[in-house]
Regions:
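Short arginine-rich
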Residues: 42, 65-78
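GIY-YIG nuclease catalytic motif and its immediate N-terminal context
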Residues: 1-37, 41-53, 58-65, 82-84, ...
């Protein structure tokens, strides 16, 4: 099974949210539709700007924790390294099973 660590943004250089999931397509859909009450709904954080994939749940959880502890500037640098225009990557995730291991794409 694949696991994904992802970063959502409200806009370029806006509010950021780091999460982990086993189903990125479903989870991004939930964020965009405000299915669950919480941070992303409150701050309108709906734009998928970065993701990476692993097959190990413990690696995904550790990476999520690591990114959550990073300084904001480091997260922005990570996003801009692979997605300099801060494009919404949610339209590119329909082929995740055969796709790249990062959302830098």
């Amino acid at each position: 099974m694949n696991y994904y660590v992802y970063i959502l943004a409200s806009k370029r250089n806006g509010t950021l949210y780091v999460g982990v999931t086993g189903d990125l397509i479903k989870r991004v859909y939930e964020h965009k539709r405000d299915v669950r009450a919480g941070f992303t709904k409150r701050y309108k954080v709906h734009k998928l700007v970065y993701f990476e994939m692993t097959t190990e749940i413990y690696s995904a959880l550790a990476r999520e924790k690591q990114l959550k502890n990073w300084k904001r500037d480091w997260k922005i640098g990570l996003i801009e390294k692979g997605n300099p225009r801060w494009d919404d990557l949610s339209e590119k995730i329909n082929s995740l099973d055969s796709g790249p291991s990062t959302g830098s794409g």
